[in-house]
Amino acid sequence: MHLVGGGLSDDDTPLLARFLSEATTRATAAARLEPARVAVVLVHDGLGAEEFDRYAAALRSAGACEPFAVLAPEGGSFAVAQLQDVDGIVVGGGLTPAYRQALEPVFGEIRRQVTAGVPYAGFSAGAAVAAETAIVGGWRIGDVEVVQESASEDLDEVTVEQGIGLIDVAVDVHAAQWGTLTRLIAATEAGLVEGGVAIDEGTVLIVGEGQLVVEGRGSVWSVIGSETGVTVSSAGAS
């Protein structure tokens, strides 16, 4: 599983290299003759085709593959049939509550496929909703501001909802750029989540069977709760 702390940018193609390698391995194991089929899952506000073209170009720059679009408008939802016969799943960035709502009908299917070995890459919203307990937005807890309002995702109160369930800790994104590390710290202290990771833009956290791997130009911040408060640490690319 590959969790990227921001939406796709022009500098992010290298972050897709290991994901695409895993998808290619999956295609080979399935005896697929054509390149790896990668579902690009996007929730959009009218520019879905243009956004898909950006992701498809980045994937093809990272290696041979066959990206295909799985699109839903904000307020819509996805169906299990749209995610069949895939070697990799990319979930893009955008309004996190809209992504969570659209993906909810296929949470179980995505978990099933990832368990079966299909690699998952989430950018921004796609990383946040990968968690079992997902922070979908908000900038205040009660009357206390915990992050800048511009990071609220159109929500007032910090909101935690069921996510896909690919990782058992919360994930926040745009950590250094939007200051969302403080939201994760506050949510942990308030007992909304049991801890988690906050990922910088341009940075990917790779979660697999072995040791966690960080790649890219930023850091991944780990927040662990305890009876006496929280512990925060960071890790960069090694």
List where the protein language model places each region:
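C-terminal and late-domain segments of enzyme folds
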Residues: 1-33, 40-53, 57, 61, ...
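Glycine/Thr-rich phosphate-binding loops of Rossmann-like dinucleotide-binding domains
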Residues: 11, 99-100, 131, 138
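A short, aliphatic-rich alpha-helical micro-motif
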Residues: 83-84, 114
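Short, basic, glycine/proline-bearing loop/turn elements
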Residues: 91-97, 169-171
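Glycine/threonine-rich flexible loop motifs
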Residues: 96-105
